[in-house]
Amino acid sequence: MTNTNETIFALSTVFGKSGVAVIRISGNYTLKALNHFHIKKKIKPRFATLVDLYDDSNQLIDNGIIIYFPAPNSFTGEDVIELQVHGSKAVIKIILEKLSKIFVMARPGEFSLRAFLNGKFDLTQIEGIADLIDAETKMQAKQAIKQISGELERLYSNWRQRLITIQSKIEAYIDFPEDIWAEKSELEKINNEVQSLVQLIQEHLNDNRRGERLREGLHIVITGEPNVGKSTLFNFLAKRDIAIVSEYAGTTRDILEAHIDIGGYPIILSDTAGIRESSDPIESEGISRAKKRSFEADLRIELFPFEQRHNINCNVVNSDTIYVLSKADDAINDRNILIGGVDFLPISILKGIGTNKLISLIKKKAEEKFGHDRDTPVITRQRHRSHMQKALEHLQRFKIDNPIELISEDLRLAAFELGAVIGIINVEEILDSVFSSFCVGK
């Protein structure tokens, strides 16, 4: 764990050429930086002040903006300075080297860790900050903002407090059994409250991994026979040439991936080898991987040649599959074609037929998977899910006629697991796991 007595610093922006670079300092001795750079101006808290920065030989390093946030009203809860200088590699190096003589370089996530330890955020809010930094699409950012606002913290704190209240009643029986436990109505209230929490947590867990999927991206696989236009469609959706497009069958053997944004939703798109019987061991391995990836995918786009539409025999219909008639250059329009009771969408990348409709259909499927119409808090990480599952298991063991000590212990352990999600309990392994994923300077 970190030594919070040390004053830390780090570059909070990307190292490289830029208009502005931001360097953050936090700790009890933050204001020493003013003398270290020979800053003579009076710095007013929470106001931007233009200053000149000098080295020890009184040579000007750069001029920039300094903002001072006194404790406890800062991001970390400590004295914080944010120094904005020109995004020059040389300037950044000089300033960081000079700061290293009096302060300690922050570890990844150490500023956020101090914010957590000083009660500025709970663990789920801290994770929300990390998710916002990593967000690549509008919907990912929206989910992260909701988490930063404390949506999960309020939910889990409420459930935990309800458990603590129940446990206090159980503990009271241990000390005064004749006053409480004899009341049958009280027993029923306790049992009903526990069962209510069991139902709420079960519903929370049975969310089809919506939050985790949104963080990670929806996996979509383009599948079909060789030379049916998979790579052409892949490149079109990716908006760049990644896959080799060839008239020869079997060109794609390895699985190719592209991270794309459709309607604000993150999509991990895969182009796979054409499915067919092959005596070539390398192609056969590619086909085997294609089948495995297709099976594991959240959604499939299965391509059939438009010119062979009258010979299509679609034996297995899957609601997680979009059926497409590819190379439909001769199609009159993009109206779905019904084949064997299944809707097929004709598309032509060459003529732009059906492409917008396909994108709209992918967006609709993504909305269904992510549950865009639901406004309830969602689990966003496996860490949350593991603790919630353990809490549920403890509550499911609850039986009102169990030994009183066993009842109390199950309630205590369930509350412990809920506390572990938001960081009320101080488990070093949990904190190290959460903050190690942050970048330096955050």
Curated annotation (Swiss-Prot):
Residues that bind K(+): 246
Subcellular location: Cytoplasm
GO cellular component, one term: cytoplasm
Lineage top rank: taxon: Bacteria
TrmE-type G domain location: 217-367
GO molecular function: GTP binding; GTPase activity; metal ion binding
UniProt record, GO biological process: tRNA methylation; tRNA wobble uridine modification
Residues given in the record as (6S)-5-formyl-5,6,7,8-tetrahydrofolate binding sites: 24, 82, 120, 442
PROSITE patterns found in the cross-reference section: G_TRME
Obligatory cofactor(s): K(+)
Binding site for GTP: 227-232, 246-252, 271-274
Cofactor binding remark: Binds 1 potassium ion per subunit.
Keyword entries, A-Z: Cytoplasm, GTP-binding, Hydrolase, Magnesium, Metal-binding, Nucleotide-binding, Potassium, tRNA processing
Binding locations of Mg(2+): 231, 252
InterPro entries cross-referenced by the UniProt entry: G_TrmE (IPR031168), GTP-bd (IPR006073), GTP-bd_TrmE_N (IPR018948), GTPase_MnmE (IPR004520), MnmE_dom2 (IPR027368), MnmE_helical (IPR025867), P-loop_NTPase (IPR027417), Small_GTP-bd (IPR005225)
EC numbers: 3.6.-.-
Function noted in UniProt: Exhibits a very high intrinsic GTPase hydrolysis rate. Involved in the addition of a carboxymethylaminomethyl (cmnm) group at the wobble position (U34) of certain tRNAs, forming tRNA-cmnm(5)s(2)U34.
PANTHER family hit by this protein: TRNA MODIFICATION GTPASE GTPBP3, TRNA MODIFICATION GTPASE GTPBP3, MITOCHONDRIAL
Subunit structure: Homodimer. Heterotetramer of two MnmE and two MnmG subunits.
Family: Belongs to the TRAFAC class TrmE-Era-EngA-EngB-Septin-like GTPase superfamily. TrmE GTPase family.
Protein name: tRNA modification GTPase MnmE
